[in-house]
UniProtKB/Swiss-Prot annotation:
The lineage of its organism: Eukaryota, Rhodophyta, Bangiophyceae, Bangiales, Bangiaceae. It comes from Pyropia yezoensis (Susabi-nori). Keywords: Chloroplast, DNA-binding, Plastid. Residues 1-98 form the SSB domain. This is Putative single-stranded DNA-binding protein ycf41. It is found in: Plastid, Chloroplast. GO terms for cellular component: chloroplast. GO terms for molecular function: DNA binding.
Length: 111
């Protein structure tokens, strides 16, 4: 597992399920800002505030995600032969990205 930090633009956000240990699994369709490709990110949030976090994520455009990368799978679509990636994270911190110009961020939640 690799620790990493990502700055992403959120395009859509939906909750998949809540696991047995009450952690929420959220599926984000996001665009990595350093790349033009579309990326599907599955976030696992190990936090009791997961319903609050999910409501906040739906309102945001840009977030900074700190966590550990578990899987990095390539997805091939048959018709267009485009390659996408499915990133699976367990998230330790999520920051709201305030401004692209000022480079300031606000802590959304801390585990």
């Amino acid at each position: 597992m690799n620790s990493c930090t990502l700055l992403v633009q959120i395009l859509s956000c939906k909750s998949i399920r809540i696991s047995e240990n009450k952690s929420q699994i959220i599926k984000l369709k996001a665009r990595l800002l350093k790349r033009k490709r579309l990326v599907i990110i599955n976030l696992t949030i190990w936090n009791k505030k997961s319903s609050y976090t999910f409501k906040q994520l739906k309102k945001l455009d840009y977030v900074i995600i700190e966590g550990k990368l578990h899987r990095n799978n390539k997805i091939f679509t048959n018709k267009t032969k485009q390659v996408g990636k499915d990133l699976v994270f367990s998230t330790s911190r999520i920051f709201k990205y305030k401004s692209l110009l000022k480079n300031k961020d606000i802590d959304l939640f801390i585990k």
